[in-house]
Amino acid sequence: MSNKLVKEKRVDQADLAWLTDPEVYEVNTIPPHSDHESFQSQEELEEGKSSLVQSLDGDWLIDYAENGQGPVNFYAEDFDDSNFKSVKVPGNLELQGFGQPQYVNVQYPWDGSEEIFPPQIPSKNPLASYVRYFDLDEAFWDKEVSLKFDGAATAIYVWLNGHFVGYGEDSFTPSEFMVTKFLKKENNRLAVALYKYSSASWLEDQDFWRMSGLFRSVTLQAKPRLHLEDLKLTASLTDNYQKGKLEVEANIAYRLPNASFKLEVRDSEGDLVAEKLGPIRSEQLEFTLADLPVAAWSAEKPNLYQVRLYLYQAGSLLEVSRQEVGFRNFELKDGIMYLNGQRIVFKGANRHEFDSKLGRAITEEDMIWDIKTMKRSNINAVRCSHYPNQSLFYRLCDKYGLYVIDEANLESHGTWEKVGGHEDPSFNVPGDDQHWLGASLSRVKNMMARDKNHASILIWSLGNESYAGTVFAQMADYVRKADPTRVQHYEGVTHNRKFDDATQIESRMYAPAKVIEEYLTNKPAKPFISVEYAHAMGNSVGDLAAYTALEKYPHYQGGFIWDWIDQGLEKDGHLLYGGDFDDRPTDYEFCGNGLVFADRTESPKLANVKALYANLKLEVKDGQLFLKNDNLFTNSSSYYFLTSLLVDGKLTYQSRPLTFGLEPGESGTFALPWPEVADEKGEVVYRVTAHLKEDLPWADEGFTVAEAEEVAQKLPEFKPEGRPDLVDSDYNLGLKGNNFQILFSKVKGWPVSLKYAGREYLKRLPEFTFWRALTDNDRGAGYGYDLARWENAGKYARLKDISCEVKEDSVLVKTAFTLPVALKGDLTVTYEVDGRGKIAVTADFPGAEEAGLLPAFGLNLALPKELTDYRYYGLGPNESYPDRLEGNYLGIYQGAVKKNFSPYRPQETGNRSKVRWYQLFDEKGGLEFTANGADLNLSALPYSAAQIEAADHAFELTNNYTWVRALSAQMGVGGDDSWGQKVHPEFCLDAQKARQLRLVIQPLLLK
């Protein structure tokens, strides 16, 4: 309730002035409370279906007015709504044909359209007039009833059967109203006027699609005459974390004599752990159960207990409620956070509630997929950015085991950060403005009241990117007093250190690893977390290892990658981003920052995260295993290990399951069983993998959680076999032999024909390539401008010389080129061709005269598009780059060429590192590319780099050829952020340095 409208006095008339008054943010709402579940009988509890809840989800009626001028008195019982349309609840209006979705990040949706300041709202304020008819379930007829909106964006006025019910604004926590006196048994008419904008919109400037509607469930809640209104359960550990203590605070609607209760604590098997019975004499019930024989809760071992509270009147059960709890202690001691006595490291990701088809009306299936995929990727923590999620998500995090930062629905980014990152908090809200205190504080209170019993929530966050001020200091003070069992967080104070005390954590966004290390090595007073880091936009997350290496510092307690899922909306079978809906202003593709794609398929970045976030650190060296157990509560004997031996990519040996017992935090070196391998047999890979010993809720027995390998490298070297026939003509050099013919143009300096078994494989002239289709990080770092001279340098290379030399077992064709970029010498390519049609290609880049970076160096080949399949031996199975090799392992992999194109917004993709050989083929045959004494980077795609860079969406690309890019090297992809940070120097290519590409091209004969 606001400080303007007295809570004890019911308001009977709606007032549109509330939309622009920051001191009115809820009217006639009941106090926020815990999200426990209540049932009318033991049978209902066991079935999980409550007759005390009536869903109003489904088809509603709607009138949508873009200009905010809806039908007058539409809430009246006798209003004719026959012309209203149908709409789904829960759902976002903009995805159902009412208005358009708009994506903006920092700027407000009205920026440039209207010059307004807080708490003003745009004159164009879309209004959705919702209507729902329903009959009241019989179980409700003799009970008090509340009406609950779990999520509504942004401001709602509510009427029932013509009576004004109330008003609510906080989009992401419930607005709940008592409606008993307005209800009828049949033909009830519920009306909701939902406005897209209100003063609350200044506090909801999150980086997401701006969409409105009743996007979470709407329900009726029946309340028996004995009813649990609110339940606070503080489940902690005592006796060196071996025993449990449960502090119970229950608020009971007490309207009957001779009332009593029974509280049970039951384990996951349903066995009784503890019990307490007693009379109910007041609305407050408080007691403590001590010395409970419980197992601790953690993400590794999410042991849950069910608390059941039975309410009786004269011995008859009127209501039973349940709440899952986990017993755990989360403490801040000497500037370090501990869970159950162990220093914790958050290996986390930020996560928006998002579904490519449903917007923010996400499903249980979405949540379970996210959580299971996180667990399988060694992610142990999630930040609910930047608002409280559906209650179900926290229950699932409790169950599966994820640590959670729960964050209040408060972001006012655009009120203080301006173009270019310039800070101007002149009209920042809430800041120091006490007019915004009530609304801001209510958002924290609503979140904490609802979510307080969830074991997974370790940290309360005041909000996101809203600068600082006295309001945040007051909010922080409330949080710490209301809940000393958790730690309180707010990153915004980094912009105004006057309010440093408004957070218990030193939390920063996108700080480079070296900057973080400076903090960690200078007597840190607080624990450090990177609350947003490793910006995963497009082809990104390079050098994540620089951050995970900081875990050696006790005060470094991990971070949360930005972010989990791309926010691409599906339309006509395509995933679209900002601007594609004619939404202006917009921040375009900046909504595509996910470790998983918008359709919930995994991106190649996720394998890298899994490898670096693993709690089992494996290293194979000299045939031995170095093992570090970074689990907090799990012995490494809970996993089994396999050793595997691969020769030239083929598995030749695998051990029986092995067990290595290390306590949490311990390290050890173990001898491994390996068979003898003859030196001449080829390249040998010694691999160790760690696997789950038993089924877990998120993965089956045998699932691989970590792996490492040692390579006894043995790269192939070209050895010519016989000399081809040479035809030295005026315009061309021809080389031919049994079933092959190669033609070199003396005018162009390139091979213009490559035929094996009569089939032409060269569809266009080869070209040098020094470029790649710019990644999102490249664009943000300014590489398009800085390195533009390399984009077409290869395309416009000028032939200087071509010559031919006949050798005993081969023929050499030598070419020299100049570039429109000053080089230290000639750019040369030598082709050594033998009598079997094998071509050893050596391309030498002499280095540029000018200092700077080189994106890549190699050759582009356009091959027949019919070569649709690949098979290779190298790092895989995912694309990889010099700063994102982790999570890929040497082996033989195969698939369809089109699958090499990762569905980012079109940019560099598909590179395979440390390639030994790569085959492209169809049913008729194909080509094989082989490394020649040096590592090879190679990609095979249906599109060229030029096509990719020119396209805004993958569906715009056309497949004319199969394009091969064979590279000696390519710079890393970076990922510290996507708006300025460069690729780390050790993963860049110095343009002044000479480079050489060596590979062999030969026919692939299919048996």
Swiss-Prot record:
It catalyses: Hydrolysis of terminal non-reducing beta-D-galactose residues in beta-D-galactosides. PANTHER family: BETA-GALACTOSIDASE (PTHR46323:SF2). The keyword Protein biosynthesis does not apply. The keyword Metal-binding does not apply. The lineage of its organism: Bacteria, Bacillati, Bacillota, Bacilli, Lactobacillales. Monomer. The active site is at E465, E532. Keywords: Glycosidase, Hydrolase. This is Beta-galactosidase. Residues 29-48 are annotated as: Disordered. GO terms for biological process: lactose catabolic process. Its EC number is 3.2.1.23. Belongs to the glycosyl hydrolase 2 family. The gene is lacZ. GO terms for cellular component: beta-galactosidase complex.
